Swiss-Prot record:
Biological source species: Dictyostelium discoideum
GO biological process: hypotonic response; phagosome-lysosome fusion
Presence of keyword Acyltransferase: no
Keyword annotations of the record: Cell membrane, GTP-binding, Lipoprotein, Membrane, Nucleotide-binding, Prenylation
Protein name: Ras-related protein RabL
Family of the protein in this entry: Belongs to the small GTPase superfamily. Rab family.
Length: 204
């Protein structure tokens, strides 16, 4: 029998300049690109891989963190199986704005929200102004305590030094497959249409 092919959608989110495109570019091309112009719109690529012995197509979306993109972003938030939520570990504002990005994700999801938290630019040594590991752990714990997700998966990455880039996308792919299976299961057991509060099909 022909193996069923599964398309999983992963969306990269976070403030402008945190290094989203550099991560995305590194994952696609296996290298760091210096002097890249800022993103002017969303971009994506599709990669074929095996996740837990299942043949899947990973559709990874890069977005730009600018306000003008956020104003038009809802179509890109929808239909995701996992989000990679990025902040720069040396940029306080990008860490504080994680709450804003979470609010956006929550609008389009229900149940356990599949996301991976990514602290970027780990090749730059931490200073007093950087976000401490203790603060990041506290942020993860708050999210877990609110029941938004059972366990936050956190990676500190460097696109520049190739640290944790593949690892983060491997975990995102695994979470995306789990989410895909749950949504598929719900749509099978509720074929006539979901009750209003479940909103299958309009969420991630
Ligand atoms: N040291 C270091 N710098 C990085 C790393 N990743 C990205 N940068 C730098 O951070 C800046 C922003 O990187 P981008 O990948 O363009 O950031 P972005 O989040 O996609 O920005 P927008 O497209 O505006 O949303 C660039 O100058 C990169 O060279 C990293 O791992 N280490």
């Amino acid at each position: 029998m022909k193996e069923e092919k599964t398309m999983l959608k992963i969306i990269t989110l976070g403030d402008s300049n945190v290094g989203k495109t550099s991560l995305f570019y590194h994952y696609v091309n296996g290298e760091y690109r210096y002097n890249r112009p800022p993103s002017i719109g969303p971009d994506y690529f599709i990669k074929e891989l095996k996740v837990e012995n299942k043949h899947v197509f990973l559709m990874v979306w890069d977005t730009c963190g600018q306000e003008r993109f956020q104003a038009f972003s809802p179509p890109y938030f929808r239909g995701a199986n996992c989000y990679t939520l990025c902040f720069d570990i040396h940029n306080e504002e990008s860490f504080i704005n994680l709450g804003k990005w979470m609010d956006e994700i929550i609008k389009y999801c229900y149940g356990n929200i599949p996301f991976v938290l990514v602290g970027t630019k780990s090749d730059i040594p931490r200073t007093d102004k950087s976000i401490s590991k203790a603060r990041i752990e506290q942020w993860c714990k708050n999210i877990e305590d609110q029941g938004i997700i059972d366990k936050v998966h956190y990676f500190e990455t460097s696109a520049k030094l190739s640290q944790n880039v593949t690892e983060l996308y491997n975990v995102a792919a695994k979470l995306a497959l789990e989410h895909y299976s749950i949504v598929k299961y719900i749509s099978i057991i509720r074929p006539i249409g979901p009750p209003e509060e479940v909103k299958v099909g309009t969420c991630c």
